């Protein structure tokens, strides 16, 4: 069996006295494309932050390549795992090319400058994400979908084995949602990159992810393929609405039943 890339065992976490995650255990493997799904407040973003070493669990353990996350050098971890938050506030005016190049920072020593190789890797990341055409534009001048592609390019410039994304298609129109997810699917397929992302659209999750983890009230309800997870009775219980299931091009389709 393939070695787990990241392994979480019995993870619990609370914000002050509010429990958010309760006894979470899961593992990721090479080329997993995992969609974390579930209602608002189910713990998706918090789980991603624990996987990205942004938050420390109150109990349980996280291992990356069989080494405890608490003992791994942060710089080395940043070379292997990249994190893309939902929001990208930029106070200072940076050009797109500068933001992508920031992805090389985990490889730089203090007071050193980017090498020719760093610039080449950043350029390839922009080509892969179709952001080269606005490399010289300022980040705050481009659209939401373009900003998301730039952040993926910066994360890709880290040359990671795993990418963690918090709702990468939030607030984007359908065209940009498909564009972003297609780029991620390409990274997963061609670069063999492991992807874990929080998302709300169950139909897009079914179309692009090879594995879904359904969370509710801080616990894993179901973990498996889209066909194993997107079950009528389970979805109705978790989301509290009636749904119908169908299929299109081999993917499960979830349709809310709207009373008229």
Locations of regions flagged by a protein language model:
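The feature captures the beta-strand-to-loop junction immediately N-terminal to the Walker
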Residues: 37-39
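Helix-to-loop junction immediately C-terminal to a conserved catalytic motif
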Residues: 52
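Conserved ABC transporter NBD signature motif
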Residues: 60-68, 77
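Conserved ABC ATPase "signature" region
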Residues: 101, 116-134
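Conserved ABC ATPase signature
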Residues: 112, 138-142, 146
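Catalytic Walker B motif of ABC-type/P-loop ATPase nucleotide-binding domains
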Residues: 163-167
């Amino acid at each position: 069996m393939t070695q787990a890339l990241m392994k979480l065992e019995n993870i619990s976490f609370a914000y002050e006295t509010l429990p958010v995650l309760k006894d979470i255990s899961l593992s990721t493997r090479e080329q997993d494309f995992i969609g974390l799904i579930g209602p608002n407040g189910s713990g998706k973003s918090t789980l991603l932050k624990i996987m990205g070493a942004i938050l420390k669990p109150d109990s349980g353990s996280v291992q990356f390549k069989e080494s405890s996350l608490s003992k791994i050098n942060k710089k080395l971890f940043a070379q292997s795992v990249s994190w893309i938050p939902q929001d990208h506030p930029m106070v200072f005016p940076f050009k797109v090319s500068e933001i992508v190049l920031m992805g090389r920072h985990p490889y730089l020593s203090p007071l050193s400058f980017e090498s020719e190789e760093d610039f080449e890797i950043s350029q390839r990341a922009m080509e892969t994400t179709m952001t080269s055409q606005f490399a010289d534009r300022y980040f705050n001048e481009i659209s939401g979908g373009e900003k998301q592609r730039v952040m993926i390019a910066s994360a890709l410039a880290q040359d990671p084995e795993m990418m963690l994304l918090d709702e990468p298609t939030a607030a984007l129109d359908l065209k940009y949602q498909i564009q972003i997810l297609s780029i991620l699917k390409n990274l997963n397929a061609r670069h063999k990159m492991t992807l874990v992302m929080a998302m709300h659209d169950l139909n897009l999750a079914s179309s692009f992810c090879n594995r879904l983890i359904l969370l509710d009230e801080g616990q894993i309800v179901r973990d498996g393929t889209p066909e194993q997870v997107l079950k009528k009775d389970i979805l109705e219980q978790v989301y509290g609405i009636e749904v119908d299931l169908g299929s299109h091009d081999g993917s499960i389709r979830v349709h809310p039943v709207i009373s008229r």
